[in-house]
Curated annotation (Swiss-Prot):
It holds the Pfam family Voltage_CLC. NCBIfam families: PRK03655.1. It comes from Escherichia coli O17:K52:H18 (strain UMN026 / ExPEC). Keywords: Cell membrane, Ion channel, Ion transport, Membrane, Transmembrane, Transmembrane helix, Transport. GO terms for molecular function: chloride transmembrane transporter activity; monoatomic ion channel activity. Belongs to the chloride channel (TC 2.A.49) family. The chain crosses the membrane at residues 10-30, 54-74, 99-119, 120-140, 149-169, 186-206, 223-243, 258-278, 300-320, 322-342, 343-363, 371-391. InterPro entries: Chloride_channel_YfeO, Cl-channel_core, ClC, ClC-type_chloride_channel. It is found in: Cell membrane. This is Putative ion-transport protein YfeO. It is a multi-pass membrane protein. The gene is yfeO. One of its GO terms (cellular component) is plasma membrane. Its main location: membrane.
Length: 418
């Protein structure tokens, strides 16, 4: 016979697995549709018209039209395509299900159109809303917070292809009764995360790791180098933190989302022309291309880091539906490669991983997630102790500093962004 504790944990196991699978399937369908549309917009259509896909005209035109299209969706869809991600944390309160269709359409358009945002925030919003709405009907005794936790865990597992990130994140957020062991509280979320990760793995494998030279042995000087790199990344990120609310307020004085996003798309197009195709989209595939291109110089990496960070701020300030983690990782990779080219004595494994740690820490203010992203992009067990040590001064630098979020106007309800 199972202990009552075990029976309690098993109660939510089946819903957790179902939510994890559903979270992954929603992500897969959205990404597949976005991929097909992206291929149409950036490969087939310019080829048919006899236009180079990397021509300045095409980049500016597609991003401007993408902004107008997303603005129309936000303006006229029911629920106005959900909350503005610039005003929301990664895991937020459930939104009305009526807003989800517009949110999904806005996300797909942004992903396909080359906007420098990832899918994580809108997908998280969709999955939480569906889990809460359906779960409340099927199991009304389970509170909304439980469904929110399961959906967010399943989504994190699906996004990163592993339940490890969910385990790290929720180990610091599940502050339930001290009488209940932590792993009892983690059981159902980890079931959801594992189901999400395994389902994603059946269709595709998220590829984060970069072909960077192996780091052999940690030296004391490497800790100092890593801390300096992380501090540089944090300084760059804090510039974006300062710019985001000010640019958001300035752009949203126009009130009309079609105009705001159209202008935002045009600015993104100009940035895309400056940075080239590698500076577009969410950044994961593009950072692989950046590392593979041996022709990039120190100034090229610096330019890509600045342009991608600027594009991230513009896209978020304009109200595009998307997340900030994936493009921030791209910025970290570009910044790390630039610093390695500038000071070759510091291994690229250190500069890239510590730059990712610093910039993701600014964006998420989550130490575990920052460590995870740095470790999966530069997978080297020798780096783990160094990253844990470098995290300490990085965390001190950010203590009490503003987050990369916009304070929502008091008169604006969470699901209305017109």
């Amino acid at each position: 016979m199972l202990h009552p504790r075990a029976r309690t944990m098993l109660l939510l196991s089946l819903p957790a697995v179902a939510i994890g699978i559903a979270s992954s399937l929603i992500l897969i369908v959205v990404m597949k549709i976005a991929s097909v549309l992206q291929n149409l917009l950036w490969q087939r259509l310019p080829g048919t018209l006899g236009i180079a896909q990397d021509s300045p005209f095409w980049i500016i035109a597609i991003l401007t039209l993408t902004g107008i299209a997303v603005g129309l969706v936000i303006r006229f869809s029911q629920g106005h395509a959900g909350p503005d991600p610039a005003c929301e944390p990664l895991i937020g309160a459930p939104v009305p299900p009526s807003a989800l269709l517009g949110l999904i359409v806005a996300l797909i358009l942004g992903l396909a159109g080359g906007v420098s945002l990832g899918p994580e925030h809108p997908i998280m919003t969709v999955n939480i809303a569906l889990a809460v709405a359906i779960g409340a009907r099927l199991l009304p005794r389970v509170n909304r917070m439980e469904w929110t936790i399961l959906a967010s865990a399943g989504t994190i597992g699906a996004l990163f292809g592993t339940p490890v990130a969910a385990a790290l994140i929720f180990s610091q957020t599940l502050n339930g009764s001290s009488e209940v062991p932590l792993w009892d509280r983690l059981f159902a979320p980890l079931m959801a995360a594992a189901a999400g990760a395994l389902t994603t793995g059946l269709f595709f494998h998220p590829h984060f790791s970069l072909p960077i030279a192996h780091y052999g042995k940690m030296e004391m000087t490497d800790i100092l180098s890593g801390a300096i790199v992380a501090a540089i990344a944090i300084a760059a990120g804090m510039v974006a933190v300062w710019c985001l609310p000010r640019l958001h307020a300035m752009m949203h004085q126009m009130k009309n989302p079609v105009l705001v996003l159209g202008i935002g798309g045009f600015i993104l197009g100009i940035l895309g022309v400056m940075g080239g195709p590698v500076s577009l989209f969410k950044g994961l595939d593009e950072m692989q291309q950046m590392v593979a291109n041996q022709a990039f110089s120190t100034s090229d990496y610096f330019l890509l880091a600045v342009i991608k960070l600027a594009a991230l701020v513009v896209a978020a300030a304009s109200g595009f539906r998307g997340g900030r983690i994936f493009p921030a990782v791209f910025v970290g990779v570009a910044l790390g490669l630039m610093l390695h080219e500038h000071v070759p004595a510091v291994p690229a494994a250190i500069t890239v991983s510590c730059a990712i740690l610093g910039i993701v820490l600014v964006v998420t203010r989550d130490g575990w997630l920052s460590l995870f992203m740095a470790a999966v992009v530069v997978p080297n067990t020798t780096l783990l102790p160094l990253l844990c040590i470098v995290m300490l001064p990085a965390w001190l630098l950010l203590a009490g500093k503003p987050m990369m979020m916009v304070n929502r106007p008091k008169q604006q309800p969470p699901h209305d962004n017109v």
